[in-house]
């Protein structure tokens, strides 16, 4: 009788879960990485308010509450363990230290990022208030500062992913990301997301 009872006891998964964060500068490939992880079977924290468009054919995968991190909006973290959420690099420093994070940090040539941002603004009939040279310097300083900060956070593991290499070699990077996360993911579906035809605004063209 007791053996039967114990044999049917539920198995409790005691594996510690991390909050998975996709980060980087805007237009660095964060939405594509979110799409990859979603296709790979990782639960995504998103509100789907902002739909896919010409600027982001893969969708935006945004979650409005994270935009209030600097204001102390942290309630969403209670439901974030084991899920992936997109957070721009400027907000990473506001993540509380009582959680553990796996950060996938997207890197892309700054000239490509600026060119992509300019095209997005142009489609919306808007103009940047800052010239590219100034913006590039600001981005470079920000990236140096955030990398310095990340390297000193005991509760954060980080992998840096180069956008252009991911586009041209998605299989290799999908495996690396899966190993970094340490959770079951469908690598084949992940690697099917990057599309070189969507690799616009290359560094050689963004002069």
What are these language model-derived features?
Residues 1-81, 193-205:
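PAPS-dependent sulfotransferase catalytic core
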Residues 20, 85, 102-104, 159-161:
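Hydrophobic/aromatic beta-strand patches that form the interior of the parallel beta-sheet core
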Residues 49-57, 151-207:
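The conserved 3'-phosphoadenosine-5'-phosphosulfate
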Residues 76, 123-124:
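Catalytic phosphate/metal-binding cores of nucleic-acid and nucleotide-processing enzymes, i.e., regions
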Residues 97-102, 154-157:
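Short glycine-/polar-rich loops that comprise or flank the Walker A/P-loop
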Residues 99-118:
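Conserved phosphate-donor/acceptor-positioning beta-strand/loop module used by diverse small-molecule
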Residues 127-140:
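A short acidic, glycine-rich active-site loop
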């Amino acid at each position: 009788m007791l053996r039967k009872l114990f044999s049917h006891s539920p198995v409790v998964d005691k594996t510690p879960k991390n909050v998975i964060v996709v980060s980087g500068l805007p237009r660095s490939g964060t939405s594509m990485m979110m799409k990859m992880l979603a296709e790979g079977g990782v639960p995504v924290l998103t509100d789907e308010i902002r739909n896919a468009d010409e600027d982001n054919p893969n969708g935006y995968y945004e979650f409005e509450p994270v935009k209030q991190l600097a204001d102390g909006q942290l309630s969403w973290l209670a439901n974030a363990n084991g899920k992936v959420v997109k957070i721009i690099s400027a907000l990473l420093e506001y993540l509380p230290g009582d959680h553990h994070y796996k950060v996938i940090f997207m890197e892309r040539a700054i000239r490509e990022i600026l060119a992509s941002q300019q095209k997005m603004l142009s489609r919306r009939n808007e103009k940047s208030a800052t010239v590219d040279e100034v913006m590039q310097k600001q981005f470079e300083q920000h990236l140096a500062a955030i990398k310095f900060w990340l390297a000193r956070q005991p509760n954060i593991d980080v992998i840096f992913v180069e956008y252009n290499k991911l586009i041209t070699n998605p299989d290799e990077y999908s495996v690396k990301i899966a190993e970094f996360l340490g959770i079951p993911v469908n690598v084949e579906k992940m690697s099917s997301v990057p599309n070189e035809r969507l690799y616009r605004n290359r560094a050689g063209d963004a002069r």
